[in-house]
A protein has these predicted regions:
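An N-terminal hydrophobic leader/cap segment in hydrolases
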Residues: 17-73
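A short loop-to-beta-strand scaffold at the N-terminal edge of the catalytic core in hydrolase folds
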Residues: 76-87
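The serine-hydrolase catalytic nucleophile loop
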Residues: 102-116
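Conserved alpha/beta-hydrolase
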Residues: 116-136
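Alpha/beta-hydrolase fold nucleophile elbow
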Residues: 161-173
Length: 178
């Protein structure tokens, strides 16, 4: 009788341990290892047209006039990271680095870029984080490792827009975690 109770206890404890060890890995893979709709070829999202029609016209005009430009850096791990940038309409030392959220990319932040560039007169830099847009990587970093890339993008902004740039970093969701 004691032997049977001991075996049942070991089986129950084994199932509980297996559950609590396996489930976190499954959940992590489901949340971070997903296919990223914000990865790949760059396009201006339809959401901008539907919800921010002025931002769409502005983004199209920057695109057509070749004011919105691409740049790339290599981070400390050797991954190629991408960003868009646009110089302000008038000379300024103010720059906004606008960081996207989970499963988004730099073009998804054009609606905020419109506010900073068109209305406030800032230079803008919109990076693609790991595994997003045209940036390398095989998984989201959830903001923790992205923070190092954002610091590197700040240095790059100084090179693009001039030294002693006053910067604001504006992030949404995962981008705010940087």
């Amino acid at each position: 009788m004691k032997k049977k109770g001991l075996i049942i206890t070991f089986v129950v404890v084994g199932f509980i341990l297996a559950f609590f060890i396996t489930i976190p890995f499954v959940m992590l893979n489901m949340s971070i290892g997903i296919d990223n709709p914000g990865r790949g070829p760059i396009h201006i999202p339809n959401g901008i047209s539907n919800h921010y029609p002025q931002a769409r016209k502005w983004a199209d005009s920057l695109w057509n006039a070749e004011i919105l430009k691409d740049t790339f850096i290599y981070n400390e791990k050797g991954l190629r990271m991408h960003a868009f940038y646009a110089t302000a309409p008038s000379q300024t030392s103010k720059t906004a680095i606008i960081v996207h959220g989970y499963t988004d990319n730099a073009t998804g932040m054009l609606r905020l870029g419109h506010m900073y560039h068109h209305h406030l007169g800032y230079n803008i830099l919109l990076p693609d984080l790991h595994y997003s847009g045209l940036s390398d990587g095989d998984a989201f970093q959830m903001g923790w490792l992205d923070r190092k890339d954002v610091i590197q993008w700040m240095d790059t902004a100084n090179c693009i827009f001039g030294k002693n740039t006053q910067m604001v970093v504006h992030g949404i969701s995962m981008g705010a975690a940087t």
